[in-house]
């Protein structure tokens, strides 16, 4: 499972012109699931994302987590995080999990985050054509991969 975590002043996801979720301040998390991912991967990343200290403390040092600042989280499914660009110029998404595998793990990720955070957890709709808007704060962008545990 791969995540792109962005610290945001605000973020929103629209589906068909209707706002499906909005947060701020907090995190926008793009989540990509591959076939080999497990519930353990999901739980590890949910715990890391909730505890990652990327918000400033009183001294301006990145020392607080989204949990500690009671921030909100917007989770958006993003199968393209598993794109392979090895051959040619057209990305291959063969490593991305099929919906029947990915949806239960995506739902578990949101549930795990919600159980860890006092702030809101909002989301887009898995597999939908979505428009995501955000205002980066910093910017701070972190990439995580459960396979590499980094």
From Swiss-Prot:
So what EC number does this one have? 3.1.1.96
Q: Does the keyword Nuclease apply?
A: no
The record's subcellular location field reads: Cytoplasm
| Sample GO molecular function, one term | D-tyrosyl-tRNA(Tyr) deacylase activity
Give the main location: cytoplasm
InterPro entries xref list: Daa-tRNA_deacyls_DTD, DTD-like_sf
Annotated Gene Ontology cellular components are: cytoplasm
Q: Which reaction does it catalyse?
A: glycyl-tRNA(Ala) + H2O = tRNA(Ala) + glycine + H(+); a D-aminoacyl-tRNA + H2O = a tRNA + a D-alpha-amino acid + H(+)
Tell me the keywords, alphabetical order: Cytoplasm, Hydrolase, RNA-binding, tRNA-binding
State the source organism's domain of life. Bacteria
GO-annotated biological processes: D-amino acid catabolic process
Q: Does the keyword RNA-binding apply?
A: yes
Q: Where is this motif: Gly-cisPro motif, important for rejection of L-amino acids?
A: 138-139
Family per similarity comment: Belongs to the DTD family.
HAMAP family this protein is in? Deacylase_Dtd
- Tell me the subunit arrangement: Homodimer.
Summarize the protein's role. An aminoacyl-tRNA editing enzyme that deacylates mischarged D-aminoacyl-tRNAs. Also deacylates mischarged glycyl-tRNA(Ala), protecting cells against glycine mischarging by AlaRS. Acts via tRNA-based rather than protein-based catalysis; rejects L-amino acids rather than detecting D-amino acids in the active site. By recycling D-aminoacyl-tRNA to D-amino acids and free tRNA molecules, this enzyme counteracts the toxicity associated with the formation of D-aminoacyl-tRNA entities in vivo and helps enforce protein L-homochirality.
Q: What is known of its domains?
A: A Gly-cisPro motif from one monomer fits into the active site of the other monomer to allow specific chiral rejection of L-amino acids.
Record-linked PANTHER family? D-AMINOACYL-TRNA DEACYLASE 1, D-TYROSYL-TRNA TYR DEACYLASE
Full protein name: D-aminoacyl-tRNA deacylase
What is the scientific name of the source organism? Akkermansia muciniphila (strain ATCC BAA-835 / DSM 22959 / JCM 33894 / BCRC 81048 / CCUG 64013 / CIP 107961 / Muc)
